[in-house]
């Protein structure tokens, strides 16, 4: 008798559902065992019944097989991540290469090279770009010139101030020297007047017989 094909949908009758579960569970466990023995495969099978009852089979250890599975999933994820990163790096490199090529073309055009195939609009754009570049260059040049002029003016002011300070210092030293010399000279004159003795003489009679009389100095 030919068995009819079972329709793949949930069995509504609870008793029939439990009977079908028991039959299929035993068949699945048997197939898992046969696969592990015949093919030397590491097999782990975990089944929860509709009533949450656990059934399991493992050719070695459920925990060891699950740990191996998790490691493998992690390795696959890392490989996918590396592949994604490699693809992203290749895309970025390709994009940068295209940008560099475009910049090289633009640079040659700005130098007047490779413009034979340019249209009037492209040439006008190049001219406008050069004008803007020249304006920025001139503005920067004038800014640097102004800064250099201000720097030189500041140095000049500092030199003038230093020269003035040195001149005032020199004049002050000269005045002090003259005053010191005058003070020393006056002191010497006073000492000379105090120590100097004057001799006076009175002569009576002929020159050959005259005698002198000395008078003591007056205080």
From Swiss-Prot:
Entry's Gene Ontology BP terms: flower development; positive regulation of transcription by RNA polymerase II; regulation of timing of transition from vegetative to reproductive phase; vernalization response
Superkingdom to which the source organism belongs: Eukaryota
UniProt subcellular location: Nucleus
Residues of the MADS-box domain: 1-61
Keyword Transcription found: yes
Gene3D superfamilies: Transcription factor, MADS-box (3.40.1810.10)
CC per GO annotation: nucleus
Phenotype upon loss of function: Decreased response to vernalization, the promotion of flowering by prolonged cold.
GO molecular function, one term: RNA polymerase II transcription regulatory region sequence-specific DNA binding
Tissue expression from the record: Mostly expressed in the outer layers of the root meristem (lateral root cap and epidermis) and in the central cylinder cells of mature roots. Also present in rosette leaves and seedlings and, to a lesser extent, in cauline leaves and flowers. Enriched in apices including the shoot apical meristem and developing leaf primordia.
Quaternary structure, from the entry: Interacts with SOC1 and AGL21.
Protein name stated in the entry: Agamous-like MADS-box protein AGL19
Organism: Arabidopsis thaliana (Mouse-ear cress)
């Amino acid at each position: 008798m030919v068995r009819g094909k079972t329709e793949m949908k949930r069995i509504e009758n609870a008793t029939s559902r439990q009977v079908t579960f028991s039959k299929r569970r035993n068949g699945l466990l048997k197939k898992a065992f046969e696969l592990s023995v015949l093919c030397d495969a590491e097999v782990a099978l975990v089944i929860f019944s509709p009533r949450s009852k656990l059934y399991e089979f493992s050719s070695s250890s459920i925990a060891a097989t699950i740990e191996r599975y998790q490691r493998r999933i992690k390795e696959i994820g890392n490989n996918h991540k590396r592949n994604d990163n490699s693809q992203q790096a290749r895309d970025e490199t390709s994009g940068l290469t295209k940008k560099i090529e475009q910049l090289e073309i633009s640079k040659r055009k700005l130098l007047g090279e490779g413009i034979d195939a340019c249209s009037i609009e492209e040439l006008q754009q190049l001219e406008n770009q050069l004008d803007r570049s020249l304006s920025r260059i001139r503005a920067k040049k004038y800014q640097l010139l102004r800064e250099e002029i201000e720097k030189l003016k500041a140095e000049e002011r500092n030199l003038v101030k230093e020269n003035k300070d040195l001149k005032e210092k020199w004049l002050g030293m000269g005045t002090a020297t003259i005053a010191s010399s005058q003070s020393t000279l006056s002191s010497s004159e006073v000492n000379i007047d105090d120590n100097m003795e004057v001799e006076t003489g009175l002569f009576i009679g002929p020159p050959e017989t005259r005698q002198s009389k000395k008078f003591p100095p007056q205080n």
